[in-house]
Amino acid sequence: MGARASILSGGKLDDWEKIRLRPGGKKKYRIKHLVWASRELDRFALNPGLLESAKGCQQILVQLQPALQTGTQEIKSLYNTVATLYCVHQRIEIKDTMEALEKIEEIQNKNKQQAQKAETDKKDNSQVSQNYPIVQNLQGQPVHQALSPRTLNAWVKVIEEKAFSPEVIPMFSALSEGATPQDLNTMLNTIGGHQAAMQMLKDTINEEAAEWDRVHPVHAGPIAPGQVREPRGSDIAGTTSTLQEQIGWMTGNPPIPVGEIYKRWIILGLNKIVRMYSPVSILDIRQGPKEPFRDYVDRFFKALRAEQATQDVKNWMTDTLLVQNANPDCKTILKALGSGATLEEMMTACQGVGGPGHKARVLAEAMSQVTNTNIMMQRGNFRDHKRIVKCFNCGKQGHIAKNCRAPRKKGCWKCGKEGHQMKDCTERQANFFREDLAFQQREARELSPEQTRANSPTSREPRARRGDPLPETGAEGQGTVSSNFPQITLWQRPLVTIRIGGQLREALLDTGADDTVLEDIDLPRKWKPKMIGGIGGFIKVRQYNEVPIEIEGKKAIGTVLIGPTPVNIIGRNMLTQLGCTLNFPISPIETVPVKLKPGMDGPKIKQWPLTEEKIKALTQICAEMEEEGKISRVGPENPYNTPVFAIKKKDSTKWRKLVDFRELNKRTQDFWEVQLGIPHPAGLKKKKSVTVLDVGDAYFSVPLYEDFRKYTAFTIPSINNETPGIRYQYNVLPQGWKGSPAIFQCSMTKILKPFRERNPEIVIYQYMDDLYVGSDLEIEQHRRKIKELREHLLKWGFTTPDKKHQKEPPFLWMGYELHPDKWTVQPIQLPEKEDWTVNDIQKLVGKLNWASQIYPGIKVKQLCKLLKGAKALTDIVPLTREAELELAENKEILKEPVHGVYYDSAKELIAEVQKQGLDQWTYQIYQEPFKNLKTGKYAKRRSAHTNDVKQLAEVVQKIALEAIVIWGKTPKFRLPIQRETWETWWTDYWQATWIPEWEFVNTPPLVKLWYQLEKEPIMGAETFYVDGASNRETKTGKAGYVTDKGRQKVVTLTDTTNQKTELHAIYLALRDSGLEVNIVTDSQYALGIIQAQPDKSESELVNQIIEELIKKEKVYLSWVPAHKGIGGNEQVDKLVSSGIRKVLFLDGIDKAQEDHEKYHSNWRAMASDFNLPPVVAKEIVASCDKCQLKGEAMHGQVDCSPGIWQLDCTHLEGKVILVAVHVASGYIEAEVIPAETGQEAAFFILKLAGRWPVKVIHTDNGSNFTSGAVKAACWWADIKQEFGIPYNPQSQGVVESMNKELKKIIGQVREQAEHLKTAVQMAVFIHNFKRKGGIGGYSAGERIIDIIATDIQTRELQKQITKIQNFRVYYRDSRDPIWKGPAKLPWKGEGAVVIQDNSEIKVVPRRKAKIIRDYGKQMAGDDCVAGRQDED
């Protein structure tokens, strides 16, 4: 009781006992009420510890308040008690419980008003864009503030990582807040590589723009002076409006928010794209029985973001569906939390819940409580538990020093001094907190308590110096320890001033020396001669014992040697007394909290065997790391393990330790990549002084989150399992762990932040452990700043070794070579080889790609062609003549060194593009002619058929994105193309909304469109109706044309396809026509290729068509669907399809469309019933808005017996639908039933058994299916009933999926029926007879009949086979006249029989076989029986 009564103490307890239970009553609150309240909280799964603070009481009140209306008297009493306790904690004066409740209500009303006011302020503030505001300049005019490179980078990163998942929409909405149409088009341009998605977006924008123009017609008459014109749809999309016009509309009075309107259109298009990529309904998101609640919530909100609904509806979905669709374990907890629970509270409450593991933990917890109670009752008292022992030797709990397995520490276990044991120690206080002293030359560094806490990698407790009070007995009892530790760095020799015998001397602190050796000093005391060995040989010294030495205010007494030493040395015999340690600095910054993924545990992978030399190498490496504090030993209580191994360093005999963290990486939480890419020197501004630094042992300088360290455990085995393996865990960021880069970058950024704020004139580029520091200061001043930076980093535990400290140019940084006024890539040497392997060529291409960013003209296309196909890395690849020529050209380019210059923000960016031929392009970005910032190349072909203008557009897009990332703005382009050619192409290209600023530059070869297709039919020109057909089996085909002037032609083709024949027909028409021609085709494939106006292709046939198109003056190409009603096409179709294809005209299209509008048949059913090609049937389904809500369900035949049915109840519109599915065929019987009772289920089962052969029904464990009525019906109809596994939807998988499919079909036909029961039967009919697919391409109705008929035939056949097997056969082989047998008779046919003689199976003609009945053993072998008992 004492523990629970400690909720209040001192004066608060007195106040508590003065409060009356009721107004005017005699009874007052006592300690027993607190004890009762804490026990009640246990009952309601709330933490009793919350009662100890006002904040905790407030949390309890929030949880209990929703249950007051419907709760029991105990809940109300508990609420009143906690409310009174809250007032006592807050020192609110009250006389009784009623006053406490009034005070609580007053506080809650006040908080609610404040929250509403804050929400109102937030709404008011949200009206103004905070992201890209249109700000006013000094003249009061509105000016535009463009998107930042960081915003565009974030947008590109989201698309790359999320790939149009639902998260993309809120991210786009957030990033584009307040953006103008021009900003929005820039965002779309940066992801223009996603052509299919962008085409869908373009269509949506065009539709919305057309709708805008329809709703907002243009006013007749001229615009009044000073009045702004009204925006059209194309103006809102940024196509026909300028930036100034957009600003004018957005800031006018009244404003027209063209940016928000355009943004809304884009979001509509993004929603369509998201639905295509993520066709999952929110109703289908249910938590699996063993699925962690966090994963379920992630899936739920991902689907919710893709839903087309208002925010109110989405809020309702979150409040109801999230709980409703959780698994039973989580649902129980969520309902107990109440309706007002936040998502964070739900996730905390449900953490680790679900599955057998959760049930095992609950059971174990209950059992442990029972066990503990029994033990305490057996003891008969409530004394404290047995005190945990602690080892004097290793400091760990659980054992004493006598049983310690660790190596025995030198000196006394009590005080740490050498020369005596613990039993002889005179110290009064044991010093478990060993000293952690180090020395600094000038002044001690003050560390904050937080920094001190993180300073030790192995223990998070602060370490106290000898003589200071222990944390528990500090001056103020708070456990703080003085942390004025002297410290000295190792940038130079660690020399300190010492006092010995009243004399001052300078000495070197040497952790490698055993003894203290000094020279030129006289000590007035006894000594004895001694010989010691050193680096220079042996020297004679005088040994003085018990000599006092004072170093940095610390005193020590020990042995001192005096002799001719080159330098005074303080050895370990003195350093250990002073508590001096050699500290490898580990950053004192706060650790970043890290967790495993929800529901996952750490890796438990066994260590694989290692060779002796690897074990020795790992043992040595780990011993050094342990001494440095990077790792520490763990015992058997840590159950986790990750394999470790060793490899030899490149070109070295030294070993390197590697830990295989792949499994831990899978289980560790995800991290956001802090840095989106590496910095580029072309983006650096020219600086007067530059320094490049490298952080040494980067990862090993940052501490790992303490609670996560146990998961990094690894084991070093012993040879032949001689001893148990030595187990370690990491205290710092491990190499190879997925979180190390992100945490290091984050830590480094925090550390550099104060230095950057203090020194804004210093530019620091940080990428992992590489630092580029630039300034316009004079060199001496700059170096002082560098020294200050290095000291700042060292304070936080980051060393910057002299070895990698670059003070003078050229600076080697990130693979680049930096000079004061120029930069280049580090020298590249191309190898000279006779034989090239795949790996050699890969490395060569990598080097050339790296060089191409500053060396213009580099080409790699022919070299890359050598790598096509699946080849091993060691395969020898002969260089083609083209590849040799390309390599020779590249070598010539690399002979002369080329340099780039630095960026000047005051000058304009210019990008110039040149065509190199063979689909290769090169470009330079510069600010002054012949002084390139950087260069690059482009050699991608995104499609098989392309043209130069399209490729140039792709180059422009790549350069624009690259420039935005490096400089934050797009350059002005100089392109080798005439403006008319460019604008002709871009008019039809989707990105017409964003055209960069550019000018024509006459750099041969120029880009041009070699031909142009007409938009309207050419009057007077001959019209060619073309068609082609191919037989899939024979690969033969025909192509031909018919003209409006009576000409016709057909050619036969071999080894062809339908697509090739369609293209060949167009080629024939072009070849045989005049300079002007109209061509009509029915091939969307051919039309798509030619309308893109390619001037090169991978297809020889398309190249021939291009050659013919270039010769023409005018060409008009048109498409007609299915040739219907077009005479010319009807004629040519008959010509080319004769003997090639059976169905030519698709007369069934209208009937199929009518059928689909009524029944919403799937494409297979329509293709089968109306003889339609699959592409046409699919197009009918695709054009139906009701069939595009979700992807079409795939139906397959399950391997189950013909008599098995699955039954389940589903709910729709508040009514119950009982569904039965024939498992083998997918056939459905369903009807709406009045109530979910056993009687209704039994009646339905009897009806089902009267229609179909039902042998087994499989149901869930619902009360209706486990009722006596259902059991009786099953007994009467001789049906076996089986039950599913509780909470496992997979056990009812067939009927569960059919429930979804049935609801989907009901949704498609619901508006055709007044009542739900009618719609259900219509949906059953459609599913059973209007949807085809699966094995055999049958509908479900056809399939069940086929299965039952086949089953009957099989059974009858089996009876015949059984009957036949009662006969034996005597037979003759070919010319052998002797009868053989008897043999078994597996099968009897009309002209032959199948016999089995021993293990051999033969087919024998009936005329050579005699079949007799098997009468038993006595008749076997009797020759005459063969004649008498002949069955024939």
UniProtKB/Swiss-Prot annotation:
Sequence ranges assigned to domain Integrase catalytic in this UniProt record: 1198-1348
Q: Name one GO biological process term.
A: DNA recombination
Record-annotated membrane-spanning stretches: none
Q: Which GO terms describe its cellular component?
A: host cell; host cell nucleus; host cell plasma membrane; host multivesicular body; membrane; viral nucleocapsid; virion membrane
Protein name per its UniProtKB record: Gag-Pol polyprotein
Q: Where are the zinc fingers (Integrase-type)?
A: 1147-1188
Q: Which gene encodes it?
A: gag-pol
Q: Which PANTHER family match?
A: ENDOGENOUS RETROVIRUS GROUP K MEMBER POL PROTEIN (PTHR41694), RNA-DIRECTED DNA POLYMERASE-RELATED (PTHR41694:SF3)
The species this protein was found in: Human immunodeficiency virus type 1 group M subtype J (isolate SE9280) (HIV-1)
| Lipid linkage positions (N-myristoyl glycine) | G2
